[in-house]
Amino acid sequence: MDEIYLNWDKMFDEAFRIPIHEIKNDNIVFSGIGGSGIVGEIANILGVELSFKRKFTGKESLIAVSYSGTTSETINDVENAVKAGSEVIIITSGGILEKLAKEKSLKLIKIPSGFQTRYAFPYLFTPLIKMTTKRRGIKINEMELKEGVIEAKEQIKADATRLAELLINRIPVIYSSKYLAIAKRFKQEINENAKHPAFYGEIPEINHNEIESYVHGPSLVSVIVESSEIDKITEDVLNSIVIKPYFNSDEKNISSLLALAGVTSLEMAKKLNEKPDKLYNIPKARQLTSNLFKIN
């Protein structure tokens, strides 16, 4: 299964060809949850300034991302934005959101279906970053997203094996400053693929509180996704495992480090004899949330 992440370069190739829409407003609000939601936080690494305050006045553009098209929280945001008269752009592979887009003549970006959401990052992220950087007037080299996976592929395999050995049967807490969203994604991948506890936190905030928890937290293991000089303070204090970015380019680091997170979590799943695609608790939570929002 490691190949799912290591073949992201091919998925990026396909994603580059997905048609996008123009964003009308400067106030860009993002809605998404889980594997669909993290793409907005990662996009902000590249300076696109997405807002996550989902109160709609009609003067903003909502970009709603749900791979399945059935995420209750995102559907609710779309309905509220439509009522307010906001511009709505939907990125999805189908489901209720595709139906809503067609019924209400909303802007729709249809992406390939048939994957677990967390495996489909290139399809979710590429249209989002192309639209938002264009609106913000930010120049990025989108081909570097593909190149990051290709150029780091062998190192990713080796590092994932090493990390899985270090993290298994401990509780990893993944920290970063600039790359906080990547740390969060590491945590999510370990949770969902390996069914293993993991948490994340933001540097420098944790240097003022959380680092004291290691006094009585022998099962915790600190992991730093290094992104600035201040990260090294936490590394020194907690004797952390360090994940060093492979490149100087944010675009290459985003794709390669997220691929590393995915492959590491799959290696942990193997050691725990877990099936990455099997879900124990999430389906029940989804159904209860759907009931709460009265989504059919």
UniProtKB/Swiss-Prot annotation:
GO terms for biological process: carbohydrate derivative metabolic process; carbohydrate metabolic process. Residues 12-143 form the SIS domain. It catalyses: D-glucosamine 6-phosphate = D-galactosamine 6-phosphate. Pfam families: bact-PGI_C. The active site is at 192 (proton acceptor), 208 (proton donor), 286 (proton acceptor). The keyword Chaperone does not apply. This is D-glucosamine-6-phosphate 4-epimerase. Belongs to the PGI/PMI family. Gene3D superfamilies: Glucose-6-phosphate isomerase like protein, domain 1 (3.40.50.10490). One of its GO terms (molecular function) is glucose-6-phosphate isomerase activity. CDD domains: SIS_PGI_PMI_2. InterPro entries: Glu6P/Mann6P_isomerase_C, SIS_dom_sf. NCBIfam families: G6PI_arch, PRK08674.1-1. Its EC number is 5.1.3.42. Keywords: Isomerase. Involved in the synthesis of UDP-N-acetylgalactosamine (UDP-GalNAc). Catalyzes the conversion of glucosamine-6-phosphate (GlcN-6-P) to galactosamine-6-phosphate (GalN-6-P). SUPFAM superfamilies: SIS domain (SSF53697). The lineage of its organism: Archaea, Thermoproteota, Thermoprotei, Sulfolobales, Sulfolobaceae. It comes from the Archaea.
